[in-house]
């Protein structure tokens, strides 16, 4: 496919230099459906990006679109703060019946604001309030958001530098396999906790991603996550799982921690929780932690009722019968087999992932960007991941068809060959 660079003048002259994704994908997109986007010139692109994980069910999913249109056409509440509404009630009841009860999860539900970093900030605030401590432990290559509290537990040096002030009360520890298996799990962490001279203040909580999406598709082993939960219990620290990108079915189960059999004290959800790409986030926590005073944490747009409508619809449509998890794992197997074949032909590459999130890394760290650039030329949207953008990240919609997935994987294989 030959793509003529579009007229981007208004974006280049008026919009801030902070824009990023559009620099790698120089097109003006006009419409989208399922796993495909179309630009204003009629070029079609297969989407292996899915709105950075916000579009697990594809673009303009017809089931969700119908529910949203019906709600708007009857003049349903749009802006509701934390007032009781029929849309919020329907979502809460559906979430409880379809997600929480079948998994025997007792969580209370908080609507902290519309974005993922709102959810993380509320989780950090609550953990500190409950424990009466300031420090929170995070992990190397973590990403938890771009506001100050979230940045303090984020690893990426470039993003941290944007804060412009010291980021305090966050301490990084080695993520799973950070030392390539040469150091026992949590050796350093436990030594610091037990040594009164280590200089580590007793943490209120530990925050972790089961798969580090922005950090390079680093996958924590189930046994590592179980050991982390046991460590938190022994040391009386709360365990926070940031499931903003890896939750809502991305790794197979609705929650990414289900495979490990752990029950975090606090869970953050956003991105695909609304199902339609509408802003929405949740902070879930065990009932005994619900010590908030009314209004102690709030936000103008925490009551985004159209998002509640699509969120309830997606749970009914995709999670009530248990088929979504099976389908995602089957699609993941399809990806894994293709990546095995690609890496067999490309000895400098390796891959890792779970469900429908995968990463491919090359010895030449610049190769990932070259692969993604060539993919765009061929009509496939891929992004990079990792602190040096050294990983090609595959994040297609969960609803992608086997044929579309195969098409995208064939394009990926071609890009790997052509950038060698």
Curated annotation (Swiss-Prot):
It is an enzyme of class 2 (transferase). Pathway: Amine and polyamine biosynthesis; ectoine biosynthesis; L-ectoine from L-aspartate 4-semialdehyde: step 1/3. Its EC number is 2.6.1.76. GO terms for molecular function: diaminobutyrate-2-oxoglutarate transaminase activity; diaminobutyrate-pyruvate transaminase activity; pyridoxal phosphate binding. The modification N6-(pyridoxal phosphate)lysine is found at residue 271. This is Diaminobutyrate--2-oxoglutarate transaminase. Belongs to the class-III pyridoxal-phosphate-dependent aminotransferase family. The keyword Transferase applies. Coiled coil: none annotated. The keyword Disulfide bond does not apply.
């Amino acid at each position: 496919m030959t793509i003529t660079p579009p007229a981007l003048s208004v974006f280049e002259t008026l919009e801030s230099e902070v824009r990023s994704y559009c620099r790698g994908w120089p097109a003006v997109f006009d419409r989208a459906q399922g796993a495909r986007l179309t630009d204003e010139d009629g070029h079609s692109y297969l989407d292996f990006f899915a709105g950075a994980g916000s579009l697990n069910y594809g673009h303009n999913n017809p089931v969700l679109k119908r529910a949203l249109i019906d709600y708007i056409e009857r003049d349903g509440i749009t802006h509701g703060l934390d007032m009781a509404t029929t849309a919020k009630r329907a979502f809460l009841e559906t979430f409880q019946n379809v997600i929480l009860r079948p998994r025997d999860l007792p969580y209370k539900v908080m609507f902290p604001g519309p974005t993922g970093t709102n959810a993380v900030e509320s989780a950090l605030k609550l953990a500190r309030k409950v424990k009466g401590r300031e420090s929170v432990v995070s992990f190397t290559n973590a990403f938890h958001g771009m506001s100050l509290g979230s940045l303090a537990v984020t690893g990426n040096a470039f993003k941290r530098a944007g804060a412009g002030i010291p980021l305090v009360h966050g301490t990084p520890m080695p993520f799973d396999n950070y030392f390539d298996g040469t150091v026992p799990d949590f050796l350093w962490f436990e030594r610091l906790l037990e040594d009164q001279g280590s200089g580590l203040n007793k943490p209120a909580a530990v925050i972790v991603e089961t798969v580090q999406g922005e950090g390079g598709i680093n996958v924590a082993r189930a046994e590592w996550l179980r050991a982390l939960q046991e460590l938190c219990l022994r040391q009386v620290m709360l365990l926070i799982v940031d499931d903003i990108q890896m939750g809502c079915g991305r790794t197979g189960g609705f929650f990414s921690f289900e495979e490990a059999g752990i029950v975090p004290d606090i869970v953050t959800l956003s991105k695909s929780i609304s199902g339609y790409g509408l802003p929405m986030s949740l902070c879930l926590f065990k009932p005994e932690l619900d010590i908030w005073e009314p209004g102690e944490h709030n936000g103008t747009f925490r009551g985004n009722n159209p998002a509640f409508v699509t969120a309830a619809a997606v749970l009914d449509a995709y999670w009530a019968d248990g088929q979504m998890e099976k389908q995602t794992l089957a699609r993941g197997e399809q990806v894994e087999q293709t990546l095995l074949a690609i890496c067999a032909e490309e000895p400098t590459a390796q891959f890792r992932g779970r469900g429908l999130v995968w990463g491919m890394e090359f010895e030449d760290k610049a190769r990932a960007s070259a692969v993604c650039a060539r993919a765009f030329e061929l009509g496939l949207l891929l992004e990079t991941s990792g602190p040096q953008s050294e990983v090609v990240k595959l994040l297609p919609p969960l609803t992608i068809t086997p044929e579309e997935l195969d098409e995208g994987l064939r394009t990926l294989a071609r890009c790997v060959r052509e950038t060698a």
